[in-house]
Curated annotation (Swiss-Prot):
An annotated GO cellular component: extracellular region
GO MF: ion channel regulator activity; toxin activity
Native organism: Cyriopagopus schmidti (Chinese bird spider)
Cellular localisation: Secreted
Protein name: U8-theraphotoxin-Hs1a
Family: Belongs to the neurotoxin 27 (Jztx-72) family. ICK-72 subfamily.
Domain of life of the native organism: Eukaryota
Pfam families (alphabetical): Cys_Knot_tox
UniProt remark on domains: The presence of a 'disulfide through disulfide knot' structurally defines this protein as a knottin.
Main function: Probable neurotoxin with ion channel impairing activity.
Signal sequence, renumbered to the chain: 1-18
Amino acid sequence: MKAILLLAIFSVLTVAICGVSQNYGNVRYNYTELPNGEYCYIPRRRCVTTEQCCKPYDTVNNFAACGMAWPEDKKRKVNECYICDNELTLCTR
């Protein structure tokens, strides 16, 4: 019983320190409806054009883009939405 409790505490601490995998960075984006009735695509979602990707609230310092990336299965490159920082050229993926 003590081992199970220690394992549970360790798991909670690990998640609290490392965070979760759905963290898109500290860049906030505007989740809006597109003209075709769909909603914009969040970062890491596959896209065809940049217009499909959610735009950041701060458009002066950040921009959204649709670019090539290796998916998790690493079979072939696909287009995914990004939000990038203008000055640092860092993108959340």
